[in-house]
């Protein structure tokens, strides 16, 4: 069951962002609240957040241009 847009959080817990890193580059991630993604600038990948859970699998990530 997916959350509706109005139920999605606009932020990610700061502690979670401090812990999570890109599995490809081991670099930092940025939260994009509009797309519900964690962005790795180094790997040029956007990891989806589904039902409040970050999906940190490179094969599930969207490639950035």
Swiss-Prot record:
Domain of life: Bacteria
Coiled-coil region(s): none
GO cellular component: cytosol
A UniProt-annotated Pfam family: Trm112p
Similarity annotation: Belongs to the UPF0434 family.
Organism: Rhodopseudomonas palustris (strain TIE-1)
Name this protein carries in UniProt: UPF0434 protein Rpal_0270
Signal peptide residues on this chain, from the entry's feature table: none
HAMAP family, per database record: UPF0434
